[in-house]
A protein has these predicted regions:
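N-terminal secretory signal peptides
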Residues: 1-14, 21-29
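Extracytosolic ligand-binding ectodomains
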Residues: 2-4, 17, 34-410
Length: 410
């Protein structure tokens, strides 16, 4: 690693070291637990998230969810099966570049004795880092969406969120159900998606669901991540005659798309593909234009307020889905370590496959628990539909878990 220095940051409950390198503002931030009595060796968990670049806010949210649970576990006695061993988070910035993420993963594995790695939000980043962790036989647990993540026969990858194609299909099917419940019939839709692993895979699920329902796709438009003007996309949308639009975008693009739609007085329902559509910055960036925007999501904070309210109190914003998923992932990982009675990566991998993890933060997932099959997919994960209502994100579908009925404007 190019010349680095160690910076010690103190807080009320922990002291953190941040190793700052030349390519990333934050290369590592392990928890260091100090007390007056001997401790069992700490269990090192790698956290590789995009803490800078286009996806930085998502990475920060993921890190916050992980730190929140790690702090709670450490404060209540650590990992019991290992004599109260504390969790030591080794945090690195993946930036938003897959090549950089891969290099950082190699460095982290070389320089630390790790039990597992959590990362890296964006599917393209996770695809890169999981190739490295597979070669090292270290479990990689992720909340990324792309189907390919658990479709490569890697024994060490675990995907807590639904696959993108499942999310895309639910995004479409839930929308049709909501519109029909409101007495509206959709015959034409538009799909616009960023041409990344996430956007491409999710659009595939949307496309197949529309075909199965005999709904005409009158616009099917990929675009490069990081647009600074959505005028052309929205002009095509207006000309298409679509009755609903399904945009798949990260934060900046989602704001451009919805703002341009509303400024051009295009009032058809917009149903986002999670990502940029379900974090507080979306509403902050759009104000009143965010009201009633729908989105698919792997989970939502209002499904587990007894758990998520304390996150809001600490961090000052509602617990977004990526924070919840990473909290549930770390909780499940710690349960696996407890059952394995070992922090050895291979022992943990064996337990993760096929075991059911219940209680704690796993209850915050719509499936009520987490269970990974032999491919590493969480088979209990079920998407939900959320909607922006008065600056809050509310679960509106399916009816069995809805906190309020959806608002539909055809």
């Amino acid at each position: 690693m190019p010349g680095h220095k160690t910076v010690t940051i103190a807080s009320a409950s922990t002291r953190r070291r941040a190793i700052v390198g030349g390519t990333a503002a934050l290369i590592a931030a392990p928890f260091v637990v100090r007390s007056g009595f001997a401790q069992s060796p700490a269990v090192n968990i790698g956290v590789i998230q995009p803490l800078s670049g286009a996806n930085a806010q998502f990475g920060i949210n993921c890190r916050n969810g992980i730190e929140f649970v790690a702090d709670a576990i450490n404060a209540t006695g650590g990992i019991k099966a290992l004599g109260g061993a504390k969790i030591n988070l080794v945090v690195s910035d993946a930036t938003s570049n897959p090549s950089t993420a891969s290099t950082i993963t190699e460095q982290m594995i070389t320089q630390n004795e790790l039990t597992a790695i959590l990362g890296a939000f964006a599917s393209s980043l996770t695809l890169a880092i999981s190739e490295v962790t597979a070669r090292a036989d270290i479990p990689c647990l992720t909340n990324s969406f792309a189907d390919e993540i658990t479709g490569r026969s890697l024994e060490s990858i675990f995907q807590v969120a639904p696959k993108a194609s499942v999310i895309g299909r639910a995004q479409f099917n839930y929308t049709i159900a909501i519109s029909e419940a409101a007495g509206s019939k959709i015959e034409k839709i538009a799909i616009m998606y960023e041409d990344t692993a996430y956007g491409t895979a999710t659009s595939r699920g949307l496309r197949r669901a529309a075909k199965d329902a005999n709904i005409e796709i009158v616009m099917d438009e990929p675009y490069p991540l990081g647009i600074n003007d959505a005028t052309l996309l929205i002009s095509k949308l207006r000309a298409s005659g679509a009755q609903a639009v399904f945009p798949l975008s990260y934060l900046n693009d989602s704001i451009f798309i919805i703002r341009t739609m509303r400024q051009q007085r295009i009032a058809i329902p917009a149903i986002g593909g999670a990502a940029g559509y379900v974090i507080p910055d979306f509403e902050k960036g759009l104000g009143e234009f965010a009201e009633n925007v729908l989105s698919i999501s792997p989970t939502n904070y209002d499904l587990a307020l007894a758990l998520t309210d304390s996150f809001r109190q600490r961090f000052g914003y509602f617990m977004v889905h990526e924070a919840i998923e990473n909290a549930a992932t770390l909780d499940g990982l710690v349960q696996a370590i407890e059952r394995a009675k070992s922090a050895k990566p291979k022992a943990v991998i064996e337990v993760l496959h096929g075991a059911r993890f219940e209680g704690g933060w796993t209850k915050a997932m719509p499936g009520g628990a987490v269970q990974f099959d032999q491919t590493g997919l969480n088979t209990l994960s079920v998407p939900i539909m959320v909607q922006w209502r008065n600056k809050e994100l509310v679960t509106v579908w399916p009816k069995a878990v809805a906190k309020a009925p959806p608002v539909w404007h055809s």
